[in-house]
């Protein structure tokens, strides 16, 4: 894993095309990301997926939301190492709820994740867990009404659908 972290994602894409003997590899995200630590090595690991939302308050009972959140943490704790948390924000371009910040980077690092990729915003730049990069669609100040909607059912981020166990190589590209 150490060697893979030392190269950037465009190099990985090129290597895959060489190995396939043709151009046209397209298993990568589209769009522009914000990287919490753009000069850090790449994030390499196996996907652990979830979907979140937060623009509006959840309509389910608080005990249901709380139980799902605990199931989410158990899900992130499981799986092969190293792990990358991948969260799709179902609010899309209107996403305002930053799941990823100081608290969640610290918690997920403790669960064995080495980084996160999200279609939603991140926050608490400068206060995130050291060595836990987040690659997000945007930066925002609030967690709003963020809550977990699905766990382990896949997550689509910038046009690429991730499934649990997918091998990920990600950086500021």
Spans of features found by a protein language model:
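Ligand/cofactor pocket segment of small-molecule handling proteins
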Residues: 105-144
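Acidic, glycine-rich flexible loop/linker segments
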Residues: 137-173
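Intrinsically disordered, low-complexity regions enriched in acidic/Ser/Thr/Pro/Gln residues
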Residues: 1-79
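Extracellular/luminal Protease-associated
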Residues: 74-118
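Short coil/turn connectors at secondary-structure junctions
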Residues: 44-45, 80-83, 111-114, 129-132, ...
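Buried hydrophobic positions in well-ordered alpha/beta secondary-structure cores of metabolic enzymes
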Residues: 16, 108, 166-168
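General beta-strand structural signal in soluble alpha/beta enzymes
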Residues: 25-28, 86-88, 116-120, 136, ...
């Amino acid at each position: 894993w150490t060697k893979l972290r030392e190269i950037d994602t465009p190099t990985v894409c090129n290597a895959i095309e060489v190995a396939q003997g043709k151009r046209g590899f397209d298993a990568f995200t589209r769009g522009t990301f914000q990287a919490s630590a753009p000069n850090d090595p790449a994030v390499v690991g196996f996907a652990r997926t979830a979907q979140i939302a937060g623009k509006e308050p959840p309509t389910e009972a608080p005990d249901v939301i709380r139980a799902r959140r605990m199931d989410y943490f158990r899900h992130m704790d499981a799986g092969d190492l190293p792990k990358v948390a991948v969260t799709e924000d179902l609010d899309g371009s209107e996403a305002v709820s930053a799941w990823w910040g100081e608290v969640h980077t610290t918690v997920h690092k403790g669960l064995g994740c080495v980084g996160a990729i999200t279609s939603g915003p991140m926050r608490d730049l400068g206060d995130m867990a050291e060595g836990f990069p987040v690659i997000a669609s945007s930066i925002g100040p609030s967690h709003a009404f963020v809550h977990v909607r699905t766990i382990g059912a896949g997550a689509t981020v910038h046009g690429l659908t991730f499934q649990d166990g997918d091998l990920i190589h990600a950086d500021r590209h």
